[in-house]
């Protein structure tokens, strides 16, 4: 259970104050010898993190500490500091605010809107967890700074920032909801960080937990309108990147801000807003760059509306966020946007000075995994970057530490407060999802397969949608001991329900709060028209309806929710976890294939092709024989994603051709003829097996012409007939992602100590 600190008697700690002149004997201070210009502010706050640990004659060098990915956060080494540099120039004085925490490490910091206080994340020693603290930036009458601990408990709280109205946002790996702490759905080894807030005065007594994502949400930053942005690791099937989202301080209205529809790099991290909907941050590869990369500007303004281009304009009644057409400018063009060694170093954690200049950390050298291999940490110091001359002006660099997270200590305008109703609503209250008109879309995509013999625009295809399938996502937190859900990049999946599309194109559904979902509009044949590549979620009682299927949020005539009556009434899709429809292969699919298909398609009738792999370490050569079409339960051993697995022959036969097409089989040799892609994850309409079976709709029409695609196995005799439900079962297992494992066949047990059950959330 979470241990709370009484907010009225929050732990107060004091440290010595550093003075620019007449330094007291207890102050830990350093002056730089380099020359540099004035930053235009009196002080900057920054963090120091340790890379070299000396213990007697033993020296340990920690470059990334296993935190190779930009969203990782658990790199602890003792001896870090939270400092102020004052005056904010190269000959200024460094004062350590956390001097008595000699074994601490720090994980994010921010300065209050009035410039009098800082918030930071600190892990005091190796037996502690990262928690949130505040510190006064003005010494009291005794010449001391006061530190107050704001969070506690058996979880890590990191990356804190100030929000309007006296709140603090941060990322946490606290367990909540029956699913517990999420395990990232890509490597299944990281404890996923979610978003939360507390109040400055109340700390944990006012803790509120946000709707979840399947992978990390980190690095929040304040936005002009009172919301806050953050970096979100998105993994949904083939999507695997870090993009920018925003949310209200109450945990509602999670929306994309940029990077969803293209960006110059895989990952965007550590953004700060320069002006409304214009941000600077780091663009880089998701891993192998030590949280560093190129400086990138992202402009998510609606350029079609002149009002939105005025930084001081009144945006009331204007849709000024246009994430679909976000524009990117790489400010450091010589820095690679991938994980290649950099010829000019890499940047970390930029912020913005009042005059618009960029204050950032920078290190020379390759700044990638070559540093780890050579056990040579990059030397991050603090600089001002000139985007015109492409030069760095040194502010401060202590070569014994990484100098990070530099922020100007200066008052700034506090954004407006966004009202929060989440804490007044029961935690189990459903969210409302739906569309005004599903066929309304701004996406420039086409759909092909089945009845679409040639590609048609998405908007045209959506006019034939009869329902929307709502799919819950989960990862290995729900399937213990499972690191892959099968021969697929997709996560675990459960169908919450299928909502009908009404005559006006509308649909509505009530769905559980907090969990991740994505949507599939389906046609009269039960085939997905499109697979949404973005997780959506909502807080209890939240209205998350949309205009259409990714309809434009800008321009004239865009309807607003609540003002447009629709025919649809909300379907109830709030069943308990054991009652949700999952399609695990051993229990749902194999019995069907054994009964109806394996009599003709088995080990005695199939041909084989082979995959040969040479182990790069041992040199051992292994050959795997893959059946072309064996729909029996015969065990087959296969190699996939650097692991060896055993699955039923039917599962391997149907999905392995699509697995090979993913291009993830480096260092292997294929011998023989690979069959067609019988079953394609997320794409039943283009799967060869579905075209072989054919599908009949309720109106008697077929997905494929019967002249070329007679119904199978019915063409082999009535005794082999598949029912419509059996055909739909096969379609769903493909459209959901081709998962072998599910909660229902891995012994999932819900987490029962759910703190969101309290009304305070």
Predicted ranges, named:
Residues 2, 16, 156, 216, ...:
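Generic N-terminal simple sequence motifs
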Residues 1-12:
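Bacterial N-terminal signal peptides that target proteins for export
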Residues 19, 29, 323, 549, ...:
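General secretory precursor processing signal
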Residues 41, 77, 445-457, 463-465, ...:
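Aromatic- and Gly/Pro-enriched helix-to-coil junctions and flexible linker segments
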Residues 27-504, 510, 531, 535, ...:
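Sequence signature of WD/YWTD-type beta-propeller architectures
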Residues 17-41, 558-566, 761:
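Bacterial Sec-dependent N-terminal signal peptides
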